[in-house]
Amino acid sequence: MLLGAFLAISVLAAVGICAGSGVFETLGWLWVLPVSFAGTFVCLLVGFFLLMLGMSAAVDMKKPQEKDSPFYRAVAMNMIRLVVPLLRIRVVETGLEQAPASGRFLLVCNHLHEIDPAVLLRAFPKSQLAFISKREVSNMFLVGKFLHKMLGQPINRENDREALKTILSCIRVLDEDKASIAVFPEGGIRGGHVLHPLRHGVFKIALRAKVPIVVCTLRGTHTVLSKALKLQPSQVELHLVGVIPAEELAGQTAVQVGERVYEMMARDLGPELVLPRTEE
């Protein structure tokens, strides 16, 4: 784990500095040791951030990404594993044992905050999740370029023809066994931190690619950053509600599948976290 490695290196560096300077022979080590530890740790964090900046600068967003980049994915995963404990985020994961042990799938989840993809990447490290996201995400600092290298699929929901191209691209990614696809079918972060109606078009991906649908729900991600700024711990809950086998999708329409997924999510979240139908 990257955080553990950084801590170990910082301890060794601090001890080495104290031993090399001879301060262990005086009471000076009482301040030299913690200062050396903190300084080394901060330098490691800054160095890792600079590495990510350099990697981001090297990405050409105009060049199509033909395959998943293990290097960029590994760096992103390590960044997530580093940030979660630093921000004192407790992630409670349940139901993950239901996830397909092999093969590709379409993962769908409700959307509360920009950090949601990080929570899903952390929970499914071996699934090579490629996210469908709105075009604006491509311009987000660091995030857009790293998602691009991990086969991210930007979608233009305002243009049906462009949206169809993204759906067809996702189907190819699944057919060619390049990655599993993850999407937030509400179509973005909506108001009230509750579940909104789903956009059914994305379910054509599972129907055409003949892959199972992994249905998840998230709670609490919208509170993480505000609590972190107050130096308070936070809790995020990720629940894998269920898996719809590919065989059960045969003969169904995207609307039918979307309604089934919506009911699964709504039942799991409970009425207090679901927008009433009368308010749609």
Regions found by a protein language model. Name each.
Residues F6, L164-E280:
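Non-catalytic C-terminal accessory region of glycerolipid acyltransferases
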Residues N78-M79, R90-G95, P117-A118, I167-S169, ...:
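A generic local structural motif
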Residues A99-A101, N139, D160-A163, I244-A250:
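A short acidic, often aromatic-flanked loop/helix-cap motif at beta-alpha or helix-coil junctions
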